[in-house]
């Protein structure tokens, strides 16, 4: 704008300021949104009164922008009743300058729209075979595990090479970690040298299946790690000289089962329903009876109130496996699953 010579200086300055204000206002009249929904509308309002350049400067793939300068009531109606804002303009139409974050890459999908997909860098992986993850699942290789971590499990790591095992035989744990078998009969690599903090209350005490009182869940985990096999949780609180299950109080929907072999009780979950599966293998239990499955054995234990454990797989009168039982007991503990408070 050029001021005419005959115009007063004050009026010219006022017009200049007004023009500048209108330019700034028009540049900030849009609304910035965090995503464009499948219906084509903008959703999740990020900030109002932003220009498209400001809104799209983050590099996020899903960020979108609308140019309408509307009041709060209209924005509210769009978000609550209309499924988002109309005339939604995505910031990114191609993969150029898209930041997908670590382990992901931008690729154009079948609809010719940019999308972030999991693409971990597997070039430095030397072990090409299967690996066992911290979730207890076997992955065909470490690259497959990295993809699973990218998609839904950010804490997922490789705990050891090879398929997940039921015993510590042939399990080589990395670093200073040690293999331990938990009560679900799965081998895990754990670190035994962690320092357990002193418990702030005696209410943290736990009674182990070995009849020993542990100061906290951490102390029980450490003892389990050093032993190399599961000790297991009998019940919460200090161990008592119980004469029967009537002396033991179980919480969390658990039921006391009495172990006549050692004269102690333990609290076990008894709400598991056994699936109708023909693939389950029969087991020989500690009462020398054969059950259709380990789950059926647990049901019988919960019904009778007497603890049952697996002696060996198969029928009780099918084979005599005294030596095999001794080998199994070195690595496995077929008692009930450990409390979630004791998970590694």
Swiss-Prot record:
* Annotated signal sequence range: 1-29
Disulfide bonds, paired cysteine numbers: 32-55, 42-88, 56-91, 95-106, 100-116, 118-150, 122-143, 132-164, 168-179, 173-189, 192-225, 196-218, 207-239, 245-256, 250-267, 270-302, 274-295, 284-316
In terms of InterPro entries, this protein maps to: Fol_N, Follistatin/Osteonectin_EGF, Kazal_dom, Kazal_dom_sf, Prot_Inhib_GrowthFact_Antg, TB_dom, TB_dom_sf
The Follistatin-like domain covers which part of the protein? 94-117, 167-190, 244-268
One Pfam assignment: FST_N
**Where does the record say carbohydrate is attached?**
124, 288
Keyword Transcription assigned to the entry: answer is: no
Q: Which UniProt keywords apply?
A: Disulfide bond, Glycoprotein, Nucleus, Repeat, Secreted, Signal
A biological-process GO annotation: positive regulation of hair follicle development
Record domain TB: where: 30-103
A GO molecular function annotation here is: heparan sulfate proteoglycan binding
Biased composition regions of type Acidic residues, renumbered to the chain: 321-333
Subcellular location per the Swiss-Prot or TrEMBL entry: Secreted; Nucleus, Nucleolus
Q: Does the keyword Glycoprotein apply?
A: yes
Name of the protein in its database record: Follistatin
* Gene expressing this chain: Fst
